[in-house]
């Protein structure tokens, strides 16, 4: 049984504040996350540069998938930094781990989280990235609360959504 489905959590929402909760992208769609056009479509290099991440900080990529953003951030923060890759799908984390090993990166910690909790250590993160994943949160209040607990005093959250999933 996957950790995300731990039955101790609150019931999942189908909508939140009038917004339909999108279905989580299945791990079998992972190749799409690495598509060649992604840089052109999303201007990822520009976005990462604008984050102004510094060597030695700790970052968390919520909904990391197979690590498209995680690996970029891990490279910037360097070996003295700590990157947390947080995902509810262990299959995605396995792919991320393989990519990190291939790239020789050892500063990435994988976290298989639950739907309602990022499962990050408290007051441990300088920067949190949620790239194109918030619309999939079935427990938005609980997730944001757990992310807030993980932030250091001056921690920053970046919420990035590329398109409207809900027709409303």
Model features per residue range: what roles?
Residues 118-128:
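A short acidic, Gly/Pro-enriched loop at the edge of an enzyme's catalytic core
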Residues 60, 66-117:
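Class I SAM-dependent methyltransferase SAM/SAH-binding core
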Residues 75, 141-156:
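A short glycine-rich, Lys/Arg-flanked "PGG" loop and its adjoining helix->strand segment in the class I
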Residues 58, 82, 154-156:
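Short glycine-centered segments of the SAM/dcSAM-binding site in methyltransferase folds
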Residues 156-168:
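Conserved class I S-adenosyl-L-methionine
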Residues 59, 128-129:
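Hydrophobic beta-strand segment of the Class I
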Residues 2-60:
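Class I SAM-dependent transferase core
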Residues 131-134:
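Residues lining the SAM
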